[in-house]
Swiss-Prot record:
BP-aspect Gene Ontology terms: L-tryptophan biosynthetic process; phenazine biosynthetic process
CDD domains: GATase1_Anthranilate_Synthase (cd01743)
Catalytic activity: chorismate + L-glutamine = anthranilate + pyruvate + L-glutamate + H(+); N-(5-phospho-beta-D-ribosyl)anthranilate + diphosphate = 5-phospho-alpha-D-ribose 1-diphosphate + anthranilate
Protein name (record): Bifunctional protein TrpGD
Amino acid sequence: MADILLLDNIDSFTWNLADQLRTNGHNVVIYRNHIPAQTLIDRLATMKNPVLMLSPGPGVPSEAGCMPELLTRLRGKLPIIGICLGHQAIVEAYGGYVGQAGEILHGKASSIEHDGQAMFAGLANPLPVARYHSLVGSNVPAGLTINAHFNGMVMAVRHDADRVCGFQFHPESILTTQGARLLEQTLAWAQQKLEPTNTLQPILEKLYQAQTLTQQESHQLFSAVVRGELKPEQLAAALVSMKIRGEHPNEIAGAATALLENAAPFPRPEYLFADIVGTGGDGSNSINISTASAFVAAACGLKVAKHGNRSVSSKSGSSDLLAAFGINLDMNADKSRQALDELGVCFLFAPKYHTGLRHAMPVRQQLKTRTLFNVLGPLINPAHPPLALIGVYSPELVLPIAETLRVLGYQRAAVVHSGGMDEVSLHAPTIVAELHDGEIKSYQLTAEDFGLTPYHQDQLAGGTPEENRDILTRLLQGKGDAAHEAAVAANVAMLMRLHGQEDLKANAQTVLDVLRNGTAYDRVTALAARG
């Protein structure tokens, strides 16, 4: 018998579900999703065999009251079962995407195929189920097992270690012919005690033998890192082993999905938006080109959710510059999303969303060398943008990072390096690996491709955050140096291409026109005014 806290996402199916569970002898208490998350966490703490169940409901997961916060705080600590909207929330919480299913289903019977494992053991296959949904989960991260599907759509997921699972369909419906049995087997699975095993040691041994990890193994390793479960000497050995051999795209993707799953949630928009970001570490100490480009892109009508951190190797990282502009780095997720909606730009401060990285910081500081963590920053944007322009500090990283973006499910992205800089530049050819609908194309770009004049790298030199603020203030007000204008124009033009505007020369001219009318600076002051 389970003690179930059923979170009601304001849906009549909640009561059908409660009746089914109570018929089978389970204790069920129901709370609506407008109750503070802490109140529900305190209530769960009083239960003997607690299970959190997330009901169906209208709308999208990010708007379902306290549900996203509950998932962030409780996954891995107690069993969680999600149904329909609850299932979608689980997919999002672990780093997946929820979007339109292509049709609106209301009481439709479908026969899904499943893996016959765990909660589906012994059930009919295909299994008739009831579907009531217009959204569906996709880009499911490696940490979740897809254990049921219908015509390529995800119908169920589970996380064995965390004892978290979700069903896109309704097991409590009469149209789900074996729904009662499925619920019982799910609760039995959820309450099983995992035998403690040292599952990380075989993974570490593979690294010591210079073998490449699978995406799942890398995911497992870095999940342990962000939970603080790895000893410093183990983490140091793992990072150095991968560095010497060279990190594989599947290893980078596994680490990225682990960090995304453990990140604080951000209400992901359904409209098209992008990130423009560099790894840093190129040693150029240039002005903050990608940060300036984000504001200019917004003034050009694009939407940019920029993920960034303080400086590691330069005098001024993106967050250092933003702080100098008076922009609040601790802006909460809802306010940041509102800024993205209304201004076309927001900034997500990495330490606010990825608190688990604190466990790796002492080791990184002691090693004093680049490791896999140096390339993870651009890949772990908690907003999960479908588009990205990513600069890398080494030409050897261009193709591997593009391959990683493909594994992570990006819709379209470009990875670039140019003459020692982690962005598109005009002083040297820009090496590009462009991902578009699963295909990667490699090519080079020069200043001529943008219709711009080449400039020397020295003309992009920056300084302290305050010095860079003053430089970019002039630039965004339409009073900047020609070299600075051209650098931003090239990068925003490339970002516009990722949005389907293929003509780089026309794009660059549009950017220059916007730069010179000063409207980009209005985005800076408006964002700073939001506090």
